[in-house]
């Protein structure tokens, strides 16, 4: 068993009051310019460019628990339970569970938003619907338990995986 390591990471707040959030790449770039940091004891080494999200949304307590910090990373790292912090064009970021990525399983079945037309002939190389319209990611937003979000990949600016959940002692 490894010893716990004391690590200092940026701490960002994620709450229902997201009107103050910048959308797109601007928010992602400001994470590491943040002046608010937290020291945590990690059981394992965290990937580079990790940061903590202080989740204040009561609907997320079911998943994260009370007095926790969700640790995300903007590096290419496997997501814990397929949970991501997702940045969208012209909308505030959200935390969600990736249910399906249609761009990864291209050609493995029927498209979600397929519209039959006379041009859908098996031998045809031309489709009346642009391929980019088929590249959707389906998320279950953790702050909206009833909601599923279908998002075109072209509308996603970034997707940071959840790498660790830190429980704060009070």
Each predicted region: which residue ranges?
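Short, positionally conserved secondary-structure boundary motifs
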Residues: 1-66, 77-79, 104-105, 112-132, ...
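Residue-level recognition of conserved beta-strand edge/terminus positions
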Residues: 72-73, 87
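Short acidic/polar capping segments at secondary-structure boundaries
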Residues: 76-77, 91
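A short pocket-lining beta-strand/turn micro-motif at the edge of beta-sheets
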Residues: 94, 133-135
């Amino acid at each position: 068993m490894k010893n716990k390591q004391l690590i200092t990471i940026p701490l960002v707040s994620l709450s229902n009051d997201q009107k103050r959030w910048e959308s797109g790449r601007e928010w992602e770039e400001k994470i590491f310019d943040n002046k608010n940091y937290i020291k945590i004891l990690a059981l394992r080494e965290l990937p580079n460019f990790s940061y903590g999200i202080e989740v204040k949304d009561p609907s997320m307590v079911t998943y994260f628990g009370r007095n926790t910090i969700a640790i995300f990373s903007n590096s290419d790292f496997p997501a814990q339970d397929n949970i991501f912090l997702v940045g969208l064009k012209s909308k505030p970021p959200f935390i969600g569970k990736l249910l399906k990525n249609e761009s990864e399983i291209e050609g493995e079945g029927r498209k979600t938003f397929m519209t039959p037309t006379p041009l859908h002939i098996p031998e045809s190389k031309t489709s009346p619907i642009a391929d980019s319209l088929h590249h959707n990611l389906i998320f279950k937003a953790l702050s909206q338990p009833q909601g599923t979000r279908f998002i075109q990949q072209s509308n996603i600016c970034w997707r940071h995986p959840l790498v660790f959940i830190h429980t704060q002692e009070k």
